[in-house]
């Protein structure tokens, strides 16, 4: 039997798509007559649509232009050939290509001109232009971003006469609540579609190191909708439209949005600190299933199973143990490990939280203060392009200290430079390092890193990265 291949698509729109003419007919969810006494969403939309904008971006994308010849040279020898050899016989290894793209965004502060969107909409942009529903255009600058949560905040230059959107409490959402998606699909202009909340706490299973705790909706969402608004029937923001799953790249009734509470927490951190300071609970685990529930004598069928509690972590200090099952955070139900992972990461370091967990069939409540996730600070504090797209954590095992690469995003600079998941970085520019903090210190004095000392299996070699 032939399997259908489903693809997770970010939904920003490259302008090259516009050169292809097509018309797609898709089934559209409709709101039943009992929603309210009103027979139209128009009054609500008239207030909300001016707060949803279109972002046009221009920039230069980095692409790998190395000759395949260099790929045949063992990693341990490449360092000794030097830059001149690579330029003469293999190309410079990196080139830039102009790109343009379209996406959507939401005005969240009218007086200051703040617009919330997805990171993948503005990633790599040198120029950002924001167009309002009334046709006015503003130049914009990037205020801050968080790649792992796919959130970015931009600010309009000289904002005036803007409309902002109000945040809803996304923790109060229920499956079956009505949703309205607003954005600019395929560059056609602002478009409104409707549906319901299909699922909450959804993860796509992506292996990219991102934090996923999506609202799933069947409202029609297509390319160009990225960064646009998902609102409730009161016109309040419940999510930022981010991705779709589709066999064809178009709407298939499965769309994902970042919850408004999660986005709001990230924006507050960006405005306060200039970066996202992730919280760290200090647990490892997975999803609760029927077999685990039976083995650990609990009746719950949903929750986050704790398989390991890290030493000296917030979780250990609060008394959590391996085998505990977390069922709620701050009074809100936890359905999966991915959900609590995302909520902890976006809550912020130093924040106090409460957890409800099951142990030996009994429910317990505990409060704790989250620690800082130092591994999440690398992209904000350093300028080492070769590590773009790599998820890092401190490594201390088997008598070796360094930085472990736990995940590599496909087609990222880290992947292009030859880094692989499982690599251990133990040195930079011939200086030994034992953790991410030491790497940051080296880069403060030597920002132009040229070589990383890598342990890969039984191999110890230098990898040329500049």
From Swiss-Prot:
The active site is at residues 120, 150, 226. GO terms for cellular component: periplasmic space. Pfam families: PDZ (PF00595), Trypsin_2 (PF13365). Its EC number is 3.4.21.-. The keyword Zinc-finger does not apply. Residues 1-29 form the signal peptide. One of its GO terms (molecular function) is serine-type endopeptidase activity. PROSITE patterns: PDZ (PS50106). Disulfide bonds: none annotated. It is found in: Periplasm. It comes from the Bacteria. Its main location: periplasm. PANTHER family: SERINE PROTEASE FAMILY S1C HTRA-RELATED (PTHR22939), SERINE PROTEASE HTRA2, MITOCHONDRIAL (PTHR22939:SF129). This is Probable periplasmic serine protease do/HhoA-like. It comes from Haemophilus influenzae (strain ATCC 51907 / DSM 11121 / KW20 / Rd).
């Amino acid at each position: 039997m032939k399997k259908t291949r489903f693809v997770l698509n970010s939904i920003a729109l490259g302008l090259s798509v516009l050169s292809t003419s097509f018309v797609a007919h898709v089934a559209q969810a409709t709101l039943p007559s009992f929603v309210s006494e009103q027979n139209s969403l128009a009054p609500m939309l008239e207030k909300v649509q001016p707060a949803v904008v279109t972002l046009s971006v221009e920039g230069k994308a980095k692409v790998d232009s190395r000759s395949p010849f260099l790929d045949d040279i063992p990693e341990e020898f490449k360092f000794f050939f030097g830059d001149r050899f690579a330029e003469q016989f293999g190309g410079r290894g990196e080139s830039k290509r102009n790109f343009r793209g379209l996406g959507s965004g939401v005005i969240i502060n009218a007086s200051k001109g703040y617009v919330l969107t997805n990171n993948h909409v503005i990633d790599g942009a040198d120029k950002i232009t924001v167009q309002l529903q009334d046709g006015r255009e503003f130049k914009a600058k990037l205020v801050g971003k968080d790649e792992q949560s796919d959130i970015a905040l931009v600010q309009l230059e000289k904002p005036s006469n803007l409309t902002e959107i109000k945040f809803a409490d996304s923790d109060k959402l229920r499956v079956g609540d009505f949703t309205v998606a607003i954005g600019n699909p395929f560059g056609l202009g602002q478009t409104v579609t409707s549906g319901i909340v299909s699922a909450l706490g959804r993860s796509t299973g992506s292996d990219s190191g991102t934090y996923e705790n999506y609202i799933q909706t069947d409202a029609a969402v297509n390319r160009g909708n990225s960064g646009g608004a998902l609102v409730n029937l009161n016109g309040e923001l419940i999510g930022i439209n981010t991705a779709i799953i589709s066999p064809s790249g178009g709407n298939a009734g499965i769309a994902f949005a970042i919850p408004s509470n999660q986005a709001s927490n990230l924006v507050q951190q960006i405005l306060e600190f200039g970066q996202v300071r992730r919280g760290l609970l200090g647990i490892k685990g997975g999803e609760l299933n029927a077999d685990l529930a039976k083995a650990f004598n609990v009746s719950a069928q949903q929750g986050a199973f704790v398989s390991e509690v890290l030493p000296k972590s917030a979780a250990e200090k609060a008394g959590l143990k391996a085998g505990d099952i977390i069922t709620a955070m701050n009074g809100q139900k936890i359905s999966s490990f991915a959900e609590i992972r995302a909520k902890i990461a976006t809550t912020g370091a130093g924040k106090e939280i409460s957890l409800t967990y099951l142990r030996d069939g009994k429910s317990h409540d505990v409060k704790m203060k989250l620690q800082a996730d130092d591994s999440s600070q690398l992209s904000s504090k350093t300028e080492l392009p070769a590590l773009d797209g790599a998820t890092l954590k401190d490594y201390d095992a088997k008598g070796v200290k360094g930085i472990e690469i736990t995940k590599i995003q496909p087609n990222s600079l880290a992947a292009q430079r030859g880094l692989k998941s499982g690599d251990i970085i133990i040195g930079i520019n011939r200086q030994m390092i034992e953790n991410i903090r030491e790497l940051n210190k080296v880069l403060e004095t030597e920002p132009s890193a040229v070589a990383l000392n890598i342990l890969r299996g039984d191999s110890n070699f230098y990898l040329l990265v500049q």
